[in-house]
From Swiss-Prot:
Residues in TH1 domain copies: 787-980
Annotated region described as Disordered, given as residue ranges: 1-40, 960-1102, 1144-1270
The protein's name in its UniProt record: Myosin-1
Ranges of biased composition (kind: Polar residues): 963-974
Keyword annotations from UniProtKB, A to Z: Actin-binding, ATP-binding, Cytoplasm, Cytoskeleton, Hydrolase, Motor protein, Myosin, Nucleotide-binding, Phosphoprotein, Repeat, SH3 domain
Primary localisation category: cytoplasm
Domain SH3 span(s) in chain numbering: 1092-1153
Source organism of this protein record: Aspergillus niger (strain ATCC MYA-4892 / CBS 513.88 / FGSC A1513)
Domain IQ: 733-753, 754-779
């Protein structure tokens, strides 16, 4: 229910999964529940409100203000208004289009605060409360005749049938049967009156039964107060029950032939009021709906035939006419009508004559049966007997139909809860009111009493009982009126009526006079007045005057034994079903009167309603003319007063909207507090009251929004309750989101892992084709040509199209188009180079060109493309195009130069070309010729300088030549190259980098496969134990100083990746002294025992290997020995890069750790060859000089250790690393335990100097040791 007068701050909040609750304001500026951010989109899409949709928001509470608001909304087609949970409905007398499926769906799963007032909202609330709280519900619809009670009941049934779910066929069948009861019971129980074209002339309480899933499994209907007198007579402009007009107008020919059915004008019971039609109602179509409804509820064709046989009998009984005979007694005027009635009832015609014209009288004496006399009836008495028979047949037939419907609607499963819908005709005040109006108004008084007890009195009584502070409201309790009618002591109206019937039962007039005398005893009651032949009862709806005449006869409600005997003599089994009771001729007890029956029925109804949680719909009739847009303020104001709407508004404004026992409240909302629940389980150990307090505290409900009673918690506004419901729904919604997030995280993690595997695989295998092509180039040269050092790099790949001639866009496309190369051709090779150009009278000189090699099925050429400037414009054109098949040979030298010639032998000179990627060109050309390339490698280059004139170009090795070849006078000067047998070096290992997280954001794994951060990332420095300041070491021993990053857990809680060099620098810094010039301190105290040093080895010879499990080392390096094998191989680790691998034992010399001495002498000046670790290029040069004097290193053992038995740390893969595991470590305790040893533990004075002396000694004696080994 959106309010246009909501104070600033009142917001709306949508609930998850279909239900929403609004956090609207309480009304004094406070906001119920937790404040929410206003959503402008919601406000902008809301329909503009007319007046106020809840009367509790009226600024002035009065009957006139309520009337004005209802009128304003009625004029704008807004017929529904709230009073808290009570719905006020004004009958529009026309179709507003507000009951369509689209409108129904808009109310599904919504609370009343977020949708406009509607009967669908009441139905949704009742259904939701039944499912959520497992309480039986009932909807009490009250109001006067013609106010729209029946329509409201039908819409509630429509909504519940639509939203109650259930795809099972039996459940759907139950829904269909429940909906089918409407047209069926309306046909037999509704009629046109002066005030209403479809007035319910009976009371109906429909109880829908549901299983634990909220699916309808059955229903039960209880009917009250059928107005059977309407069967035999109606006032002008009213009609009999609808079924008579439907049957007479639209009966099929079968029934017309069997039962003699004619038009309604032919029957007394349907023509007495001279009203045969209802505006806007098609009786024929309604009859088809009735027949269809009979089929839906399972009524067989035989049963339908019997029902219509009884209807025909009633119509024909009404046509029996009487006249006085010579004795003044009643005589039937047309025997043929009696004979047809006898045919329909399947009895003897003579028995019908006797039952209608003669009454059996029995005399008794001394308690014994006496004589039986046949007393003739006069015409008035005969007509009364005739009408009594018709009324009895129709009344019993209606009860049979209701019972038949209940039989079909019997629950087909266990019943958990129910929703009841009460539709009973409302308060009636006519010009002449009789016994029927008294009964109707009495039942409405009982319903009003329920409303007072459940909404007003019970409200205040509960507040007092629970010791809740609130302002009491005065109200009118109509219990005194109910007591006036139903009490026995002192006797009420019904008791006086029964006494008059028992005292003067023979004469109706005498009985009526006796009744008037009994009423005089009620004159002292302030709600009763007795007048001549009438009495007035002051009902809650107004004063009603009742006529005494005929009340006693109507109260007797006794079918003569003659008529019961007639029914008992029928050979029709259905008639026996309608009149099952056998006549007990000896029973002298007074049968129950009509007032006794209606009193018992009303009390049973009240007891049923009191067992359920009620919802109220108060219907209002805007005018007596059934006009669509007419609003009679006087009539509506009267209804507002007797419905007690003003008191209802006042009590609602002063009370609490929701109350619940502590245990049920905690059971419903314990999920909202982390102290009362964990993972969906109830964890509170205290009592229910303390648990309820904790829930309200943790949900931030203001203290003024609730009160704690003795056994219940009271919530002031519905907005607060809806906020709790919203939070409860959001709890499950959030749990679902967590599961979804975890699942999406898993999928993302799986995809990320697959991508990384694919990326690694592409990185490992994507360049294999280029590497294979490069290795093929070595075979093409046949080991006859020296190689350039850059050509043997491990990172060299034969990529082919270096200029990008085959690409779209860029300079390559310009060359492609300028040279006239077809776009569909396959570019094998393109590169920039030079061609030797000969000019007349001048020496030849190289000129830049672009070489393109392409092959297709139809075009296989070598293009030589020239770029020239013509008028300052770049011109690109193919200078020469050589078919690949025309190339007889390729001539090149055996030195490392880049010159070669394509020997064609045509009319043009052979091109002499200079290309840095010559080997790759030879390889592609070989493949294009399918291995038939004639490559000539000699000490010179041959080519046809002119057609038929073979020329040679010398290639000489010039030690003074630069790295760039030079051509002069048919001689090419080049420097020395790598040996012709050289092959490409292994692919270099990429630089080790920190691993990236496997996933991003707040997902499962923040780091590598282990879920932690990268070990290469910056970590807090380990706590250093206090130690004495070391003595300065020689510069030759100290590593170069490097800045050490200051890292602390508090300053950097998250590791930051750093380059390996930075990590290594930090390690070396810890190994060095902080100063080399500081004065020596006094002798230090005793130091703790030094940590055990890990075995180290010095590298004696260079060892290069392209195997992934072998470690390449350089002479003079120090490596850490991880393990030793007895087959000549040691597993070592490079202390700088933390890379492990196998190394020949003969290439290493294990270093013996010297024991620390207390005070070593200062070392002598360091000699150039005394450096312990050759860390600079200068030191490397010294080692190279020393290597010239040493013999060749020994060959590595032929057999390496079995790698399957030991896992060797692989070389770091290409950056970026996919794993968070790093072989580099800050200390020996981290990582895998094979990290670089931390020399900080040996940083004492004695240990440092001793290690320096030992290293210097080994360096000086290394040459002799090597000679001894070889």
């Amino acid at each position: 229910m959106g309010h246009s007068r909501r104070p600033a701050g009142g917001e709306k909040k949508s609930r998850g999964f279909g239900r929403s609750k609004a956090a609207a304001d309480v009304g004094d500026g406070r906001q119920a529940g937790k404040p929410q951010v206003k959503k402008a989109v919601f406000e902008s899409t809301k329909k503009k409100e007319i007046g106020v949709s809840d009367l509790t928001l009226l600024s002035k509470i009065s009957n006139e203000a309520i009337n004005d608001n209802l009128k304003l909304r009625f004029e704008h087609d807004e017929i529904y208004t709230y009073i808290g949970h009570v719905l006020v409905s004004v009958n529009p007398f026309r179709d507003l289009g507000i009951y369509t499926d689209r409108v129904l769906e808009s109310y599904r799963g919504k609370n009343r605060l977020e949708v406009p007032p509607h009967v669908f909202a009441v139905a949704e609330s009742a259904y939701y409360n039944m499912k959520s709280y497992k309480d039986n519900q009932c909807v009490i619809i009250s109001g006067e005749s013609g106010a729209g009670k029946t329509e409201a009941a039908k819409r509630i049934m429509q909504y519940i049938a639509s939203v109650s779910g259930g795809s099972d066929s039996s459940i759907q069948q139950t829904k269909d049967m429940v909906l089918a009861t409407n047209p069926l019971l309306e046909s037999f129980g509704n009629a046109k009156t002066l005030r209403n074209n479809n007035s319910s002339r009976f009371g109906k309480y429909l109880e829908l039964e549901f299983n634990t899933n909220g699916e309808p499994v059955g229903a039960n209907i209880t009917n009250y107060l059928l107005e059977k007198s309407r069967v035999v007579g109606q006032i002008t402009n009213e009609r009999n029950f609808h079924i008579f007009y439907q049957f007479t107008k639209a009966a099929p020919q079968k029934y017309r032939d069997m039962f003699g059915i004619q038009q309604p004008q032919s029957y007394l019971y349907t023509s007495r009021s001279k009203c045969y039609d209802v505006p806007g109602v098609d009786d024929a179509a309604e009859f088809r709906d009735t027949i269809n409804a009979m089929g839906v509820i399972g009524m067989t064709e035989a049963e339908q035939d019997e029902v219509f046989r009884m209807l025909a009998a009633i119509l024909w009984i009404g046509n029996i006419q009487f006249a006085e005979d010579d004795s003044g007694n009643a005589a039937i005027t047309d025997q043929s009508v009696v004979d047809f009635v006898a045919y329909l009832l399947e009895v003897d015609a003579a028995q019908v004559n006797k039952a209608l014209t003669i009454r059996l009288m029995e005399t008794a004496r001394g308690g014994r049966r006496g004589s039986v006399y046949e007393v003739p009836l006069n015409t008035v008495q005969a007509l009364a007997v005739r009408d009594a028979l018709s009324k009895a047949i129709y009344f019993n037939l209606f009860d049979w139909i209701v019972g038949r419907v209940n039989s079909s609607l019997t629950a087909r499963g266990s019943v958990a809860n129910s929703i009841g819908i009460l539709d009973i005709y409302g308060f009636e005040i006519f010009e002449k009111n009789s016994f029927e109006q008294l009964c109707i108004n009495y039942v409405n008084e009982k319903l009003q009493q329920i409303f007072i007890q459940l909404t007003l009195k019970a409200e205040q009584d509960e507040y007092a009982r629970e010791q809740i502070q609130w302002t009491p409201i005065k109200y009118f309790d109509n219990k005194v009126v109910c007591s006036l009618i139903e009490d026995k002591r002192p006797p009420g109206v019904f008791a006086a009526l029964n006494d008059a019937c028992a005292t003067a039962h023979a004469d109706s007039g005498a009985a009526d006079n006796t009744f008037v005398g009994r009423l005089n005893f009620l004159g002292q009651n302030p709600n009763f007045e007795s007048r001549q032949g009438q009495f007035i009862v002051k009902h809650y709806a107004g004063d009603v005057s009742y006529a005494v005449e005929g009340m006693t006869d109507k109260n007797k409600d006794q079918l003569l034994k003659d008529l019961l005997n007639l029914a008992g003599s029928s050979s029709n089994q259905f008639v026996h079903t309608l009149f099952p009771n056998q006549v007990n001729q000896d029973d002298k007890r007074r049968p129950p009167t009509a007032s006794d029956k209606i009193k018992a029925s009303a009390n049973d109804l009240v007891a049923t309603l009191m067992k359920a949680q009620p919802s109220y719909i108060r219907t209002i009739k805007p005018n007596d003319n059934k006009a669509p847009r007419e609003y009679n303020q006087g009539n509506v104001l009267h209804q507002i007063k007797y419905l007690g709407l003003q008191e209802n508004v006042r009590i609602r404004r002063a009370g609490f909207a929701y109350r619940q026992t502590f245990d049920k409240f905690v059971e419903r909302f314990y999920l909202l507090s982390p102290k009362t629940s964990y993972a969906g389980d109830y964890t509170w150990t205290g009592d229910e009251e303390s648990g309820a307090r904790q829930i309200l505290k943790d949900t931030s409900i203001p203290a003024e929004e609730y009160q704690m009673g003795i056994t219940k918690v009271f919530v002031k506004t519905p907005e607060t309750l809806f906020a709790l419901e919203t939070m409860r729904d959001r709890y499950w919604h959030n749990m679902a989101i967590r599961i979804q997030r975890a699942w999406r995280n898993y999928l993302r993690y799986r995809i990320e892992c697959a991508i990384r595997i694919q990326r690694f695989w592409r990185r490992m295998t994507g360049g294999l084709e280029f590497i294979k092509l490069r290795d093929q180039g070595h075979q093409v040269l046949q080991g006859k040509k020296e190689r350039r050092r850059m050509s043997l790099l491990g990172s060299r790949r034969f990529l082919g199209d270096y200029v990008g001639v085959g690409n779209k866009g860029g300079p390559g496309e310009m060359i492609h188009n300028g040279a006239g190369i077809n776009g569909s051709e396959n570019i094998l090779f393109s590169c920039r180079g030079e061609v030797l150009i000969s000019k007349f009278g001048r020496s030849s000189k190289p000129a830049p060109r672009i070489f393109v090699l392409l092959t297709t099925q139809t075009n296989r050429h070598v293009y030589i493309v020239a770029q020239t400037l013509v008028n300052n414009q770049l011109q690109i054109a193919s200078e020469r195009t050589i078919p690949i098949g025309a190339i007889k040979s390729v001539s090149t030298s055996n030195l490392k130069d880049d010159w070669f010639s394509l020997v064609v032998g045509g009319q043009e000179p052979d091109p002499l070309m200079n290309c840095v990627f010559k080997t790759e060109f030879f390889t592609h050309l070989t493949n294009a010729l399918r291995g038939q390339l004639n490559l000539k490698i000699a000490d010179h280059i041959e080519y046809n300088k002119k057609p038929g004139k073979l020329a040679t170009v010398k290639v000489v090795k010039d030690p003074g030549a630069s790295n760039v070849d030079s051509y002069k006078s048919s001689t090419i000067h080049t420097s020395a190259g790598e040996p012709p047998s050289s092959v490409s070096k292994p692919t270099p290992r990429p630089k080790q980098v920190a691993a990236r997280p496997v996933t991003k954001g707040k997902l499962l794994r923040p780091g590598g496969p282990g879920g932690g951060p990268s070990k290469l990332a910056s970590r807090p420095a380990p706590a250093r134990q206090p130690m004495p300041q070391p003595t300065p070491q020689p510069a030759a021993v100290q590593p170069p100083p490097a800045p050490r990053p200051a890292v602390s857990p508090a300053a950097q809680p998250r590791p930051v990746p750093q380059p390996v060099a930075a990590v290594a620098a930090a390690q070396h810094t810890r190994n060095a002294s902080s100063s080399s010039t500081r004065a020596p301190p006094p002798p230090p105290p005793a130091t703790p025992p030094a940590a055990q040093r890990k075995p180290m080895a010095k590298v004696l010879y260079d060892f290069n290997s392209d195997q992934s499990n072998e470690l390449s080392i350089r002479a003079g390096d120090l490596v850490q020995i991880v393990s030793k094998e007895g087959n000549g191989w040691w597993l070592c680790m490079n202390t700088t890069t933390s890379v492990q691998g196998w190394t020949p034992e003969a290439y290493l010399e294990e270093q013996v750790a010297a024991s620390p001495k207390p005070a070593p002498p200062p070392p002598p000046p360091a000699a150039p060859r005394a450096s312990p670790v050759p860390a600079t290029n200068g030191a490397a040069a010294a080692v190279a000089a020393k290597a010239k004097a040493k013999p060749a290193p020994p060959a590595p053992p032929a057999k390496r250790p079995n790698m399957a038995g030991r896992k060797v740390a692989p070389a770091p893969p290409a950056a970026p690393r996919d794993s968070a595991v790093s072989m580099n470590s800050h200390d020996s305790s981290g990582g895998s335990g094979r990290g670089t040893p931390n020399s900080a533990s040996n940083a004492s004075l004695a240990g440092g100097l001793a290690e320096a002396l030992k290293a210097r000694q080994h360096a000086m004696q290394g040459h002799h040791d090597e000679d001894d080994e070889w």
